[in-house]
């Protein structure tokens, strides 16, 4: 079942203007990254990041994150774009940042990574596999690619936290959930936000 996207009506000197809520938030440099990370969603997030950076790269972009994770390639495309643009990207985790969501949320500008008090973080090793009827050589290729991907993601998590690569590897061996305080101690965020004090 779908959900209704609210419309916001604004008054101006030239009359009324209606926006869907996401377009209105974009005017205030707010991007909502919600739901599974997949190619279509990533393309939309990337386009919004590029648009806001081209509009004014001296102002921060606010990326609100609530995702169970998803595609590694789609998520890394978002992370690469966040690093590519000149604007600082503030990340605000609400609900959860799990799996690829953790990579994205922790890749915000250092000092500007936030989390709401009841949100959660999850790190784990990447998942994938070969389909039924796959040849043994293809399975070996998939396994090798998964190991490479795991190393790359763990390096990003180590760079984005105050933990060693070895600690990340150990903690990501199985699902490792963290509440806001644990995430702050881990170094993935810089502050737990009780109210909206973003600048």
From Swiss-Prot:
Its EC number is 3.4.21.92. Keywords: Cytoplasm, Hydrolase, Protease, Serine protease, Stress response. The keyword Membrane does not apply. It catalyses: Hydrolysis of proteins to small peptides in the presence of ATP and magnesium. alpha-casein is the usual test substrate. In the absence of ATP, only oligopeptides shorter than five residues are hydrolyzed (such as succinyl-Leu-Tyr-|-NHMec, and Leu-Tyr-Leu-|-Tyr-Trp, in which cleavage of the -Tyr-|-Leu- and -Tyr-|-Trp bonds also occurs). GO terms for biological process: protein quality control for misfolded or incompletely synthesized proteins. PROSITE patterns: CLP_PROTEASE_HIS (PS00382), CLP_PROTEASE_SER (PS00381). GO terms for cellular component: cytoplasm; endopeptidase Clp complex. The active site is at 99 (nucleophile), 124. Induction: By heat shock. The keyword Hydrolase applies. One of its GO terms (molecular function) is ATP-dependent peptidase activity. It is found in: Cytoplasm. Belongs to the peptidase S14 family. Cleaves peptides in various proteins in a process that requires ATP hydrolysis. Has a chymotrypsin-like activity. Plays a major role in the degradation of misfolded proteins. NCBIfam families: PRK00277.1, PRK12553.1. Fourteen ClpP subunits assemble into 2 heptameric rings which stack back to back to give a disk-like structure with a central cavity, resembling the structure of eukaryotic proteasomes. This is ATP-dependent Clp protease proteolytic subunit. It comes from Lactococcus lactis subsp. cremoris (strain MG1363). The gene is clpP.
């Amino acid at each position: 079942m779908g959900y209704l996207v609210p419309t916001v009506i604004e008054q101006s000197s030239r009359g009324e203007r209606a926006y869907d809520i996401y377009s209105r938030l974009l005017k205030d440099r707010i991007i909502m990254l919600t739901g599974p990370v997949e190619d279509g969603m990533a393309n939309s997030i990337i386009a919004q990041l590029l648009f806001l950076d081209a509009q004014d790269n001296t102002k921060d972009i606010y990326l609100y994150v609530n995702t169970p994770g998803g595609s590694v390639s789609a998520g890394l495309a978002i992370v690469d774009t966040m690093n590519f643009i000149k604007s600082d990207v503030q990340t605000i985790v609400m609900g959860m940042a799990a799996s690829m969501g953790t990579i994205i949320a922790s890749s915000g500008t250092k000092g500007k990574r936030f989390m709401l008090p009841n949100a959660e973080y999850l790190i784990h090793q990447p998942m994938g596999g070969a389909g039924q009827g796959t040849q043994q050589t293809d399975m070996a290729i998939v396994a090798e690619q998964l190991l490479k991907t795991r190393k790359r993601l763990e390096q990003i998590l180590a760079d984005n936290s105050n933990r060693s690569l070895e600690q990340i590897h150990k903690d990501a061996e199985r699902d490792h959930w963290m509440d806001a305080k644990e995430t702050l101690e881990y170094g993935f965020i810089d502050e737990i936000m009780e109210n909206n004090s973003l600048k």
